[in-house]
Amino acid sequence: MKFFVDSANIEEIRELQNLSLVDGVTTNPSLILNSGRNILEVTKEICSLVKGPVSAEVAATEFEDMMKEAAVLAKVADNICIKLPLTLDGLKACKALTAEGLKTNLTLCFSANQALLAAKAGATFVSPFIGRLDDCGINGSELLHEIRTIYDNYNFETQILAASIRTVSHVKEAALSGADVATVPPAILKALITHPLTDKGLQIFLNDWKKTGQNIA
């Protein structure tokens, strides 16, 4: 499973990129707002840091305007992935942009039916929001399983990009469900590394090593 960083913070992305933990990046209007920067400026900088897909989202809700904004975003860099809402106009734009050879990410997916339509529209990625489903008392990981089954049944090439990840458990659920990608906030990605027993075991080893009186280098 690939890891995308869900952030528009350059320093956070650079830190994780230096650890070789980044396969791509996803942004959205909320993350752009938090960055305090111009969308084209910050997206271009992210694309220069990361070789993988960088999702940049249109703000338009109607087809013609989506296409205009997508044309602007596509000029930022070759690794731009146009992010579109999973609506009728979004599906229409996805189909058109895919025909132009552009990567697309249909976002705000909350049902297997929506994911099926995303695949039919030729989306590169579909982004099921598992955290927001959990907020509503619906098992988000179950949706990932459903989408995986449907896609495997029909050999769809659209990749499942698990989004709205709030906890390390969400990451594990995404991996177990067969998601192709998990887009993860930097703090959650770092939290995957830690475990209290790892820290405890390391301290025991260090204490015992000191008792040997040895040096390796």
From Swiss-Prot:
Keyword terms, alphabetized: Cytoplasm, Pentose shunt, Schiff base, Transferase
Alphabetical list of PROSITE patterns matching this protein: TRANSALDOLASE_1, TRANSALDOLASE_2
Catalytic activity: D-sedoheptulose 7-phosphate + D-glyceraldehyde 3-phosphate = D-erythrose 4-phosphate + beta-D-fructose 6-phosphate
Record-linked InterPro entries: Aldolase_TIM, TAL/FSA, Transaldolase_3B, Transaldolase_3B/F6P_aldolase, Transaldolase_AS, TSA/FSA_arc/bac
Associated pathway: Carbohydrate degradation; pentose phosphate pathway; D-glyceraldehyde 3-phosphate and beta-D-fructose 6-phosphate from D-ribose 5-phosphate and D-xylulose 5-phosphate (non-oxidative stage): step 2/3
UniProt-annotated location(s): Cytoplasm
Any one GO molecular-function label of the UniProt entry: transaldolase activity
Main subcellular location of this protein, as a coarse class: cytoplasm
EC number: 2.2.1.2
HAMAP family documented for this protein: Transaldolase_3b
Family: Belongs to the transaldolase family. Type 3B subfamily.
Protein name, per record: Probable transaldolase
Lineage: Bacteria, Pseudomonadati, Pseudomonadota, Alphaproteobacteria, Hyphomicrobiales
